[in-house]
């Protein structure tokens, strides 16, 4: 009897194992051979229609393990059009008879005419797909997203990797901001301010030369549209207050003229307070400058003062007039530090922030 029970239990265990193995194989996701692996999506608006540009991986042979190489035919760009973004994506899919798989999506490029006032509607195709990473990068293009995604760069395995590396490096070195999908999906209305990097095709790489793409501008988006542009040459100090920044280029005045030095961000403290009955943004930034020579202390003081003046100027330019351009994220800081004050003014928050004052201190040390 015990042997029969043991045999029965063993058979049930084996049968259950087969069921689990079969089920787990189906839980691993869709069969990628039946999907178009999409690395980047471009969104343009032309004559009331959405124009989608999808950069996809295309193996040279069905089911092959072809390595991704933008110089070969295994990377392809598809174009689709429609009254809505899902319709435009469906147009891309009809051209190959396969569904777009967005689990590998790394970049969403926006043409200059795209309206960001309702980000949840615009990126609804991502919200409905659980495979999309919320850390996907967002960028604007100087002209059309199609032009950018059709510019094939060959220094990385896929063109998209070049764009991501460029955005990552320039954001860390205070040459542009960085914007992720989750940053925009968290906004519920059109009154938010967002900093979106701009990718610019400077050269398409004719005559066998590598294309040149730059990420040295950042669009300040308000009410869904870019209202001005921050430039790496003029506004790099402002990017030091962003969490993506880790270093920047500073200048010190010496007898021979301006001297350029690399500075590293060592610490940043930000808070919102009420001072003398007025809203005040307090900021303490610590940076370290490298290779300042014998008069390092004097140069460091000059660098700190210069950065401080630049930040004050950027604050005055952004937080004045009728509505604030919240480039330093004061609304979120206010919501965290002074929640009751935020609730009192949340319906007219940009107008309230435009009356804020700044208390900014920059300390530059010698490495």
Spell out what each predicted region is.
Residues 2-367:
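Membrane-proximal alpha-helical signals and transmembrane carboxylates
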């Amino acid at each position: 009897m015990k042997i029969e029970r043991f045999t029965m239990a063993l058979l049930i265990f084996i049968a259950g194992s087969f069921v689990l193995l079969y089920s787990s194989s189906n839980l691993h996701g869709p069969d990628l051979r039946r999907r178009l692996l999409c690395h980047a999506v471009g969104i343009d608006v032309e004559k009331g229609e959405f124009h989608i540009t999808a950069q996809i991986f295309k193996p040279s042979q069905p089911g092959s393990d072809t390595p991704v190489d933008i110089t070969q035919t295994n990377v392809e760009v598809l174009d689709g059009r429609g009254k809505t973004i899902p319709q435009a994506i469906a147009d891309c899919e009809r051209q190959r008879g396969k569904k777009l798989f967005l689990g590998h999506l790394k970049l969403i490029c926006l043409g200059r005419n795209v309206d960001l006032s309702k980000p949840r509607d615009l990126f609804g195709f991502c919200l409905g797909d659980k495979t999309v990473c919320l850390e996907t990068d967002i960028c604007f293009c100087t002209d059309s997203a199609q032009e950018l995604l059709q510019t094939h760069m060959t220094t990385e395995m896929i063109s998209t990797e070049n764009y991501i590396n460029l955005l990552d490096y320039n954001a860390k070195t205070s040459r542009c901001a960085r914007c992720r999908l989750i940053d925009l999906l968290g906004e519920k209305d059109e009154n938010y301010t967002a900093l979106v990097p701009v990718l610019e095709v400077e050269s398409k790489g004719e005559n066998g030369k590598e294309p040149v793409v730059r990420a040295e501008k950042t669009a300040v988006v308000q009410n869904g549209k870019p209202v001005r542009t921050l430039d790496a040459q003029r506004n790099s100090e402002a990017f030091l207050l962003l969490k993506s920044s880790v270093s920047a280029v500073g200048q010190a005045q010496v007898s021979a003229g301006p001297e350029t030095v690399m500075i590293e961000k060592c610490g940043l403290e930000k808070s919102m307070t009420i001072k003398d009955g007025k809203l005040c943004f307090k900021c303490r930034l610590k940076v370290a400058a490298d290779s300042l020579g014998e008069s390092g202390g004097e140069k460091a003081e000059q660098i700190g003062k210069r950065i401080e003046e630049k930040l004050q100027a950027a604050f005055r330019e952004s937080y004045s007039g009728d509505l604030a351009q919240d480039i330093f994220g004061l609304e979120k800081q206010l919501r965290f530090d002074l929640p009751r004050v935020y609730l009192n003014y949340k319906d007219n928050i940009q107008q309230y922030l435009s009356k804020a004052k700044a208390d900014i201190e920059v300390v530059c040390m010698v490495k």
